């Protein structure tokens, strides 16, 4: 049997981390078994579905590199197929037309609730032989079995059973002729030959209804696996107040897709104590049997740790391709300065996100108009004038501009003046970067370049001279 899974988001908003994890698990399961992964857009909610949301879902899937083998299919383009199946069911007697008014259904619901009963349709039209005009408004309901039960072996939770007496004759076509969600899903899974449905636990109650419809159609029933919810670190359902929940927001905040995927796969699945997984390892090791039944807690600190790990372990050239977007957001012209791959090497240890890296690298490419006030007050004092003049002259004399030779110039200045390295290094750092923090000074000065470094030292000396004149 060829394994076939699907990810079927509704385009009523962005791709959130819960949906991304479901997509990842479905994708991994298909890839592990050499099967196929289908992308289906469940856009039957015409009022809430938007083109922007569809684009956001596609952007998220592409950024995570969860490539699909079929699709994207759109349910709104398959209405003719759904209605044809409904008409066949009406002919076969597995569905029926319901003419009950909204007022009657509301009254029925109120009466049932007053008696402490579960609100459900009473089947009046199922057994009715009244004649109705062809143009009289009606819905179509599925004739759910009235006895027995539905049992399915959830691939994560084990056997789950529902009594058919607890299930309603659900509406499968509205009065406006549009098919409903639960019915469209069934026909899609049938037509697309889906073998395994992996989705959130909030769909468990839909499963017996969908299984009954599949059986009424004499269609194969897929295996189902329901993944537990993701909570915030406070134990409550993950929401915006816990931080970013949109996949693309994590991109915007400077996370690498590898970090988010690695984090999401561990939110409910494990392989011993292993924390770091390459994409290939995820594919080789993933199984539904190792997915936890318990809900998971989202921990941003853990995600940040993973992101820092991947910034420093993935190829700098690859990380640079993602950094480029953040550099553009900061409007930094990188033509006059180090290559972005070199920047990743320079700042990787200090920066936990690419956004942080982009926001802290401007001095490598552009001159600054003023020094950081606190850093200048502390380090650009009259006592720093001589160390800066000496190190400037030594840097000017370098013919082979390298980090090693820059380091030698700084060290020999300290030795010549018989001062500690900090007495040279800190004023030099503020002079060339404008701030009090940077990567190692020799590689920083080397990356900034000889001409620009000397110009900035002269600017710092001018700042010191002006400071002296005001005393």
Curated annotation (Swiss-Prot):
- Coiled coil (UniProt feature): none
Copy out the cofactor comment. Binds 1 zinc ion per subunit.
What InterPro entries does the database record attribute to this sequence? aa-tRNA-synth_I_cd-bd (IPR045462), aa-tRNA-synth_I_codon-bd_sub2 (IPR020751), aa-tRNA-synth_I_CS (IPR001412), aa_tRNA-synth_I_cd-bd_sf (IPR008925), Glu-tRNA-ligase_bac/mito (IPR004527), Glu/Gln-tRNA-synth (IPR000924), Glu/Gln-tRNA-synth_Ib_cat-dom (IPR020058), GluQ/Sye (IPR049940)
| Biological process (GO), any one | glutamyl-tRNA aminoacylation
For this UniProt record, give its keywords in alphabetical order, as a comma-separated list. Aminoacyl-tRNA synthetase, ATP-binding, Cytoplasm, Ligase, Metal-binding, Nucleotide-binding, Protein biosynthesis, Zinc
Q: Where is this motif: 'KMSKS' region?
A: 237-241
Where ATP binds, per the record, is at 240
Q: Please name the top-level EC class of this enzyme.
A: ligase
- Report residues binding Zn(2+): 98, 100, 125, 127
Q: Does the keyword Metal-binding apply?
A: yes
**A GO MF label:** zinc ion binding
Taxonomically, the superkingdom here is: Bacteria
> Where does the UniProt annotation locate this protein?
Cytoplasm
Give the CC-aspect GO terms: cytosol
What's the catalysed reaction?
tRNA(Glu) + L-glutamate + ATP = L-glutamyl-tRNA(Glu) + AMP + diphosphate
Principal localization? cytoplasm
Entry function: Catalyzes the attachment of glutamate to tRNA(Glu) in a two-step reaction: glutamate is first activated by ATP to form Glu-AMP and then transferred to the acceptor end of tRNA(Glu).
Q: HAMAP family recorded for this chain?
A: Glu_tRNA_synth_type1
Name the PANTHER family on file: GLUTAMATE--TRNA LIGASE, GLUTAMATE--TRNA LIGASE, MITOCHONDRIAL-RELATED
Protein name in the entry: Glutamate--tRNA ligase
Q: State the species of origin.
A: Salmonella arizonae (strain ATCC BAA-731 / CDC346-86 / RSK2980)
* Higher taxonomy: Bacteria, Pseudomonadati, Pseudomonadota, Gammaproteobacteria, Enterobacterales
């Amino acid at each position: 049997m060829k394994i076939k899974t699907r990810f079927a988001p509704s385009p009523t908003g962005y791709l959130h981390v819960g949906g991304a994890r479901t997509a990842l698990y479905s994708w991994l399961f298909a890839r592990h078994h050499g099967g196929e992964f289908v992308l289906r857009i469940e856009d039957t909610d015409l009022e809430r579905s938007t083109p922007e949301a569809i684009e956001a879902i596609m952007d998220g899937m592409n950024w995570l590199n969860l490539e699909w083998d079929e699709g994207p299919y759109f349910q709104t383009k398959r209405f003719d197929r759904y209605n044809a199946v409904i008409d066949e069911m009406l002919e076969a007697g597995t569905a029926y037309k319901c003419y009950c008014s909204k007022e009657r259904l509301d009254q029925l619901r109120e009466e049932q609730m007053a008696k402490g009963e579960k609100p459900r349709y009473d089947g009046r039209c199922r057994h009715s032989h009244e004649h109705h005009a062809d143009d009289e408004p009606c819905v179509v309901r599925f004739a759910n079995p009235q006895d027995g039960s539905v049992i399915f072996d959830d691939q994560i939770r084990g056997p789950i059973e529902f009594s058919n007496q607890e299930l309603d004759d659900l509406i499968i076509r509205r009065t406006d002729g549009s098919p409903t969600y639960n019915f469209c899903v069934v026909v899609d899974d049938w037509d697309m030959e889906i073998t395994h449905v992996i989705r959130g636990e909030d769909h468990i109650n839909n499963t017996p209804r969908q299984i009954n419809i599949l059986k009424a159609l004499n269609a194969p029933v897929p295996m189902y696996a329901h993944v537990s919810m993701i909570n915030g670190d406070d134990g409550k359902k993950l929401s915006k107040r816990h931080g970013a929940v949109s996949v693309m927001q994590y991109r915007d905040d400077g996370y690498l897709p590898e970090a988010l995927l690695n984090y999401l796969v561990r939110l409910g699945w494990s392989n011993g104590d292993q924390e770091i997984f390459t994409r290939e390892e995820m594919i080789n090791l993933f199984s539904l049997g190792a997915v936890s039944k318990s809900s998971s807690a989202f921990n941003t600190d853990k995600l940040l740790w993973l992101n820092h790990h991947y910034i420093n372990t993935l190829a700098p050239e690859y990380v640079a391709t993602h950094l480029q977007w953040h550099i553009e957001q900061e409007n930094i012209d990188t033509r006059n300065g180090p290559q972005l791959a070199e920047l990743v090497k320079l700042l990787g240890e200090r920066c936990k996100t690419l956004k942080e890296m982009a926001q802290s690298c401007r001095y490598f490419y552009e001159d600054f108009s003023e020094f950081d006030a606190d850093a200048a007050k502390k380090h650009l004092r009259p006592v720093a004038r001589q160390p800066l003049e000496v190190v400037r002259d030594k840097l000017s004399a370098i013919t082979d501009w390298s980090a090693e030779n820059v380091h030698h110039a700084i060290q020999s200045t300290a030795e010549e003046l018989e001062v500690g390295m900090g007495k040279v290094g800190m004023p030099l750092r503020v002079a060339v970067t404008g701030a009090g923090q940077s990567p190692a000074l020799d590689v920083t000065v080397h990356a900034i370049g000889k001409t620009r470094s000397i110009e900035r030292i002269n600017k710092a000396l001018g700042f010191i001279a002006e400071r002296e004149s005001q005393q």
